[in-house]
Amino acid sequence: MRVRNKPWAPKLIAAHPELITEDPTQLKGRWQSRFAKPQPLQIEVGSGKGQFIIEMAKRHPEINYVAIEIQTSVIAIILKKLVEAPLPNLQLAHADGQAVTAFFEPHEVDRLYLNFSDPWPKSRHEKRRLTYKSFLSSYREVLKPNGQIEFKTDNRGLFEFSLTSMNNFGMQFEQVWLDLHAVATPEDNVETEYEQKFSAAGPIYKIIATFPAK
């Protein structure tokens, strides 16, 4: 997600270390200390402006969430929302979500969300896709046994690639949607900003898949 530069972003981030970390490696294995109380931990890699993760935190106070976003101006938008309306079960990480094994101990995470990741459509870039086997290996390491990935995209090519990649990795498909909005009600589906804006243009694909226990 590209947004205009927010000159105020670095100052806001620096002013709220209680809500956002710029070095999540320092919290590896002790993320629960950042929350009001220990609870199951779920993370979103690439959180955009935060509509999805904020709504999830509101709906599920019994779960702790970490939103990971690399773009300064984008994560500052999430932070601004949190400053205005605090959520004790949501923390932010200003970092590259591709490095999850540097941020979380093995089996520290219960569920991982990938929403509308960059499809990297050229075949020579397939290793950059967040459902490539090397990323799946990292996710399996930080997720608890039988941990789940929830994946959404509007890109048919990325959807098909992800199905194949997950299947080759030995993952079990719990549910697969070829047109999520044709069957899901607003109560069942928490939308991202991108999804809300572009879902009318074509189908939204979704996968819920589980890693087999080692």
Curated annotation (Swiss-Prot):
E.C. designation(s): 2.1.1.33
Region (Interaction with RNA): 124-129
Gene Ontology CC entries for this record: tRNA methyltransferase complex
Positions annotated to bind S-adenosyl-L-methionine: E44, E69, D96, D118
Molecular function as annotated in GO: tRNA (guanine(46)-N7)-methyltransferase activity
UniProt-listed Gene3D superfamilies: Vaccinia Virus protein VP39
Listed Pfam families: Methyltransf_4
Residues binding substrate: K122, D154, T192, E193, Y194, E195
Enzyme class: transferase
CDD domains associated with the record: AdoMet_MTases (cd02440)
Pathway, per record: tRNA modification; N(7)-methylguanine-tRNA biosynthesis
Keywords: Methyltransferase, S-adenosyl-L-methionine, Transferase, tRNA processing
Catalytic activity: guanosine(46) in tRNA + S-adenosyl-L-methionine = N(7)-methylguanosine(46) in tRNA + S-adenosyl-L-homocysteine
Top-rank taxon, per record: Bacteria
Family statement: Belongs to the class I-like SAM-binding methyltransferase superfamily. TrmB family.
NCBIfam families: PRK00121.2-2 (NF001080), tRNA (guanosine(46)-N7)-methyltransferase TrmB (TIGR00091)
Name of the protein this chain belongs to: tRNA (guanine-N(7)-)-methyltransferase
